[in-house]
UniProtKB/Swiss-Prot annotation:
<dbReference type="GO" id="GO:2000142">
    <property type="term" value="P:regulation of DNA-templated transcription initiation"/>
</dbReference>
<dbReference type="GO" id="GO:0000987">
    <property type="term" value="F:cis-regulatory region sequence-specific DNA binding"/>
</dbReference>
<keyword id="KW-0238">DNA-binding</keyword>
<dbReference type="InterPro" id="IPR007324">
    <property type="entry name" value="Sugar-bd_dom_put"/>
</dbReference>
<keyword id="KW-0010">Activator</keyword>
<dbReference type="InterPro" id="IPR051054">
    <property type="entry name" value="SorC_transcr_regulators"/>
</dbReference>
<comment type="subunit">
    <text>Homotetramer. Dimer of dimers. Interaction with phospho-AI-2 triggers the disassembly of the tetramer into dimers.</text>
</comment>
<dbReference type="GO" id="GO:0009408">
    <property type="term" value="P:response to heat"/>
</dbReference>
<dbReference type="GO" id="GO:0005829">
    <property type="term" value="C:cytosol"/>
</dbReference>
<keyword id="KW-0963">Cytoplasm</keyword>
<keyword id="KW-0805">Transcription regulation</keyword>
<dbReference type="Pfam" id="PF04198">
    <property type="entry name" value="Sugar-bind"/>
</dbReference>
<dbReference type="GO" id="GO:0006351">
    <property type="term" value="P:DNA-templated transcription"/>
</dbReference>
<dbReference type="GO" id="GO:0030246">
    <property type="term" value="F:carbohydrate binding"/>
</dbReference>
<dbReference type="GO" id="GO:0042802">
    <property type="term" value="F:identical protein binding"/>
</dbReference>
<comment type="similarity">
    <text>Belongs to the SorC transcriptional regulatory family.</text>
</comment>
<keyword id="KW-0804">Transcription</keyword>
Length: 317
């Protein structure tokens, strides 16, 4: 969703000016949406839609001035313990949609990090797609270029499908996992795949989800059919605690060797991911605490968005 800065309304204002005025009346003057609609001669529905556009485009940003916003104490401890560049810990809320709230937190972090026309590399998973859905207007207005970090077009559509048609998206034209290591090697040598992988490694910022072996059936990589339950069991027995982009690592953050899927994946390996300057991990749930800690120890992420309960569990582990 983008702000139309060329169309002039009946009131003689472009859409961006309408958004700015509505935001001022709503947040600074405390007017209701009905009062604003009367003042500007707009329908209440139009006022509501313009407020939403303002949030999605980044014109309107809500800042909560409290030392508890973002759970400052947890953020400080995580930053020090794991040498993180950026941390956002969202307050815990019982029975809330954790994935959606993490997506909002991650979107806010990315809006503060990304500069116009920079490139954002995205990994697959529910957390990253939740984030992408809340960045649509910002990506379009700031001309942010997107590139996927792994194959598997379908895994990205819940996020990419929400973007403006004018957004620049570079997708790896291959599955996430090939049926054999030989086929994976062949596909990765195709120019159309190789070029996207090179673009991904050249990204300014990356955002990835973090899976945990302890999630069992709830893990995205299992629900998406990329590995079987039997494979997950064997991977766990080899000491793996979590994965990023399908690559599994142990509690120390070291990639686990002799795992079949690693040779069949089509995507950026973790060693290449580490060369991207800012690598944001977005994940929540106490059952992911060990995996998130391991991802930070391995240096695969240097920025984190998580929730209060998960942050506490990470610091206890």
């Amino acid at each position: 969703m983008t702000i139309n800065d060329s169309a002039i309304s009946e009131q003689g204002m472009c859409e961006e000016e309408q958004v700015a005025r509505i935001a001022w009346f709503y947040y600074h003057d405390g007017l209701t949406q009905s009062e604003i609609s009367d003042r500007l001669g707009l329908t209440r529905l139009k006022v509501s839609r313009l407020l939403e556009k303002g949030h999605q485009s980044g014109i309107i940003r809500v800042q909560i001035n409290s030392r508890f916003e973002g759970c400052l104490e947890y953020e400080t401890q995580l930053r020090r313990q794991f040498s993180l560049q950026h941390v956002r810990v969202i307050p815990g809320l019982a029975d809330a949609d954790v994935g959606g709230r993490l997506g909002i937190g991650a979107a806010h972090m990315l809006m503060s990090l990304l500069q116009p026309q920079q490139m954002l590399a995205i990994g697959f998973g529910e957390a990253t797609m939740n984030t992408l859905q809340r960045l649509s207007g910002f990506i379009s207005s700031q001309q942010i270029r997107l590139v996927t970090l792994s194959g598997g077009v379908g895994s990205y559509m819940t996020g990419i499908g929400q973007l403006n048609a004018a957004c620049s998206v570079n997708i790896i034209p291959a599955p996430l996992r090939a049926s054999s290591a030989d086929i994976a090697r062949t596909l990765k040598n195709e120019n159309c795949v190789k070029d996207v992988l090179l673009a991904a490694q050249a990204a300014d910022v990356a955002i990835v989800g973090i899976g945990a072996v302890s999630q069992q059936d709830d893990a995205t990589i299992i629900r998406s059919g990329y590995i079987s339950q039997g494979e997950q069991l064997m991977i766990g027995r080899k000491g793996a605690v979590g994965d990023i982009l399908g690559y599994f690592f142990d509690a120390k953050g070291d990639v686990v060797t002799n795992i079949k899927i690693h040779n069949e994946l089509i995507g950026l390996p973790l060693s290449a991911l580490k060369t991207i300057p800012v690598r944001v991990g977005v994940a929540g749930g106490e059952n992911k605490a060990e995996a998130i800690a391991a991802a930070m120890k391995g240096g695969y992420i240097n920025a984190l968005v998580t929730d209060q309960d998960t942050a506490a569990a990470i610091l206890r582990s």
